[in-house]
């Protein structure tokens, strides 16, 4: 059976796609053909092939199996706002069953599937349903990406607690430098997170402009995921 994980973040723009790309590259290099899945994406640009989201394109490029764009990203919206708002505006409700169907198809084609969320843990997909609800339904282990900046300690601890209160496994976390050069208190933030979060830090990464091209996987040890 294919292994699956859900990659969430402490906020939007904290480096989920960088971390997901690194995980995919490392898994493929270790001999586990892997697929990236971005079920819902907002903030996309019109191309000759239709709407395309940069995060989803990075997952497609770093997958170890050949995937069409629609397989990676079934729901794509142009406006960079919460999915439940833009989907209601466009009259395109997000169907949780369709998200699950897409996941099943990828499980049949890859040894590992990395599912990247949108925004943070409780991002709404509708007025009544959040991404967290879908992850709980699918019983996906969670990988938390922490954007290292002022406020990240509170955000990370709250997210980790929410994951565990949902009865899900927090597999580990990845620290991502989001502000360019590390700040003066960077190492102290990391030390506090290592002490307060219930799982180990797998890696430190840095936000980059083109995660679909950057050699990110070499910095990540995926031995724990392979167990």
Swiss-Prot record:
ATP binds at residues 13-18, 55, 116-119, 176-177. Keywords: ATP-binding, Biotin biosynthesis, Cytoplasm, Ligase, Magnesium, Metal-binding, Nucleotide-binding. It is an enzyme of class 6 (ligase). Its EC number is 6.3.3.3. InterPro entries: DTB_synth_BioD, P-loop_NTPase. Substrate binds at residue 42. It catalyses: (7R,8S)-7,8-diammoniononanoate + CO2 + ATP = (4R,5S)-dethiobiotin + ADP + phosphate + 3 H(+). Its main location: cytoplasm. One of its GO terms (molecular function) is magnesium ion binding. GO terms for biological process: biotin biosynthetic process. GO terms for cellular component: cytosol. CDD domains: DTBS. Its cofactor is Mg(2+). Pathway: Cofactor biosynthesis; biotin biosynthesis; biotin from 7,8-diaminononanoate: step 1/2. It is found in: Cytoplasm. Mg(2+) binds at residues 17, 55, 116. The active site is at residue 38. Catalyzes a mechanistically unusual reaction, the ATP-dependent insertion of CO2 between the N7 and N8 nitrogen atoms of 7,8-diaminopelargonic acid (DAPA, also called 7,8-diammoniononanoate) to form a ureido ring. Homodimer. Belongs to the dethiobiotin synthetase family. This is ATP-dependent dethiobiotin synthetase BioD. It comes from Serratia marcescens.
